Amino acid sequence: MGSSKLKRAIGAVKDQTSVGLAKVGGRSSSLTELEIAVVKATRHDDYPAEDKYIREILCLTSYSRNYVSACVATLSRRLNKTKNWSVALKTLILIQRLLTDGDRAYEQEIFFATRRGTRLLNMSDFRDASQSDSWDYSAFVRTYALYLDERLDYRMQGRRGKKKSGGGGGGDGDSGEEDDHRGTSNDIRSKAIVVKSKPVAEMKTEKIFNRVQHLQQLLDRFLACRPTGNAKNNRVVIVAMYPIVKESFQLYYNITEIMGVLIERFMELDIHDSIKVYEIFCRVSKQFDELDPFYGWCKNMAVARSSEYPELEKITQKKLDLMDEFIRDKSALAAQTTKSSSKRSNKSEEEESKTEYIQENQEDLNSIKALPAPEQKEEEEEEEKMETKKDVEEVVSRQDQEGDLLDLTDEAGVTAGTVGDSLALALFDGVVGTESASGPGWEAFNDNSADWETDLVRSATRLSGQKSELGGGFDTLLLDGMYQYGAVNAAVKTSTAYGSSGSASSVAFGSAGSPAASMLALPAPPPTANGNRNSPVMVDPFAASLEVAPPAYVQMNDMEKKQRLLMEEQIMWDQYNRSGRQGHMNFGQNQQQQYYQLPYSMGPYSYTPRY
């Protein structure tokens, strides 16, 4: 307790010293009285300032703009020197009262005034270290000064906007009427001017966004001014809270008015503006949730009348969800429309490019001009070339018709088609006809030729090359094949086969006869017909394949067949030895008895011949 009394005494001494210095300063009486009134309104005690000193300051500064500047300078020195939270808070309360009830010049002077190189109301570095429990008071001083600074900035921007719009109220200042009752004696004419701000419903959306942003920032500064700790029960703090709580009521009304306008325009706004509105509503919802308990504390502390507090309309989460859903649907629809518009634009661009291309082609076609007529020399040269080509073709055709009588290869008469036909006939039973090597192949007699006698003789000399065809489309190759069938079979029978052995009288045909022949041996040359070597008998061209050993499964089948034939032959010889009869009649009668008297044991294998 002794330390607190000592501090109070020291504070009282400082106040008396400041008053004495103001009296001895040698200034005018008005400035001296103004400085003394400021010192008395901001004493070092824990009691609120008396209202008479504040009214005296307002009265002294209402005469001249110089007194306003002197008052602001005195307040700046007071804030700069003091380290006591009570003096600093009382000075801020005086500034707030001057801004509200004083002349407009206070706003400009305080707005442009500096303290330690910064703005006058920038108290972020303030700290009272004189007491251990002064931290809560220092924090309230800092937040209170920050609120006043933000409020002053908001009002100055509103005034600048009004000046730019020519006084038509297009700025973001306070709504309602503003009377110039705070004007000085030099502004008597301006007192009659009543400035009306533009209604929010008539503002543009961008200006509404700008204004609500400033109001939300100012409301955040007010919410930060809620005292904590020991500052909640201090009388000076409660007196400082009263004016800003009254101002917060107007802030709430302005924000709700803007919210109503935004809700009306929400359906017509773009997606970008709709997102801004959604963000504004989310922020306002959080601010109203914090404002409700703050107003409850203010009511309990009797900061203002309970009837003066507004009824807060909170923004529910359901409303925010509806807004979010609407924005999502609108963005999805916009995306679809942009895709369709892009497709249409692409199609239109393609059509335009096609039309441009067609127009360019038409222009090119229209720009084509007739070429000049060719000269007579070129025509004569072309005619000479054509004549030389015709002469060469005639010489070549004559050589083809005459042929070379000494040519033994007969290349003139043999073509690729005839060679292919001869090779194909060699695979079958036809005799390849050989033409005479005396000249070209046979051609039909030309009746239109001039030298018909020589042509007749030439055609008669090549009668052997004619293709004789009988009437009715009968093929001579078929007839020759019928006559040569026996000779071909004889040649096949006489040809050697793989692994042939046995007697000539063996019933197993092909298993006995000629001795075994060597594998991969070509057959003997074909026999001639009637000793004429020029007319050979055709033999199977694939006879050489019989000399090659077949696969294993083919040889097994052949061996089984030979075994069955050998069994039949032995049965027939046994029957002949017993009864002396031959033929198949006796064989059929004794078939059952002969089966069990087989001299050879064949195992489980049994065979019944079928005739």
UniProtKB/Swiss-Prot annotation:
Does Membrane count among this protein's keywords? yes
What organism is listed for this UniProt entry? Arabidopsis thaliana (Mouse-ear cress)
* A GO biological-process term: protein localization to plasma membrane
**Which Gene3D superfamilies would you find in this protein's record?**
1.25.40.90, ANTH domain
* A cellular-component GO term for this protein: clathrin-coated pit
Query: What is the protein name given in its UniProt record?
Result: Putative clathrin assembly protein At4g02650
Q: What is its main location?
A: membrane
GO terms for molecular function, please?
A: 1-phosphatidylinositol binding; clathrin binding
For the region Disordered, what residue ranges are annotated?
A: 158-184, 337-406
Asked if the record carries the keyword Membrane, the reply is yes
Q: Which pairs of positions does the record mark as disulfide bonds?
A: none
Pfam families attached to this UniProt entry: ANTH (PF07651)
What's in the keyword line of the UniProt record?
Coated pit, Cytoplasmic vesicle, Endocytosis, Golgi apparatus, Membrane
What is the top-level taxon of the source organism? Answer: Eukaryota
